[in-house]
Amino acid sequence: MTREMLSNRQLNRATLARQMLLERSDLGIADAVAFLGGLQAQQSNDPYIGLWSRLGGFSHEALTALIVDRSVARATTMRGTLHLHTADDLIGFRGLVAPFLKAAWKNNFLKRFGSEDQKAVHKAGVRLLNKSPMTSGALGKALKEKFPTAEPLSLSVLLQMSETLVQIPPTRIWGNGSAPLLTRVENWLPPPYERPLSRIDLVRRYLAAYGPASIQDMQTWCRLTKLSVEVKGLEKELVNFESEDGRVLYDLPEAPRPDADTPAPVRFLPLYDNVYLGYDNRRRMLMDADLKRINLFADFKPGVLIDGVIAAGWVVSRKKGVARLEVEPYHKLTKKQVREVEAEGDAFLRFMEEDAETYEVEVLAFSK
């Protein structure tokens, strides 16, 4: 069977279109969060930055209001990392990845758990969290008093991997970098607490927001395994393509796949964003030479999309009334690209530092 081959650049434009990065969307915040299958939210400000680059008219206050009124919530889901989900989605996503989270705890923390009983620790942790919200550090310290042979971190993470713990305000909202307060989802979101999401629905939703994609891409995003079973079950609903490296790619027939030469605007990303973390093959979002030059998981700066790919990193600093944005390119930029980065960078810096008096944007010269 001969399949149409899609280049990395074609895949890039398809991803940008679905991720609302070709043009800002007029979707509401909760609808955008749901469509994207949640936003990576390791740092307090990450979801705000990710949504500002995707939605027209986005404001800090609008997302904070949804966090406070419990329409969206931040908890550990895909890949064992923090994500911001809608209240309707959180339980379903968490239920699907629960086996992975429990296995991750066992692989990383069982040796640090001493001779303690997991069920007893879990029961004691639930009692503590039902009394009042706690930071992870305080939870581990409190449990250590009763379970002395375990390291505090192994105790608190056991609760985070076995219970859906939500990070609640006033922590983890814009500008608040303090240690997050945790509570059980049952103490924060309204019932029902059984909101099943099927693996087949997960595949459909992934393809809508990230396709065309391979089975390896899907599994990298969520850390579920054997999704080939669900893909086979959807065979009649999907179309197939082939990637440059010979992988079979799956997609929804009516999903957008723009031309490879579709113009792509400059966009600023948070430090962690599923637009590149949600794939096994990240060459749709980074040039080969840049992938070899930078380490996505060590000393990596938040990314800047230039002509659709992550082509630079950014740093924002503040000294009294002066806000400064410094952009470090990963390869040589054209003069036109520099002007585009400066223009979008000025708007981005004003979003990041609303109360500054002076704004400075500098695009550094590329240095090999």
Describe each PLM feature range.
Residues 1-276, 280-282, 288-368:
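Long, low-complexity intrinsically disordered regions
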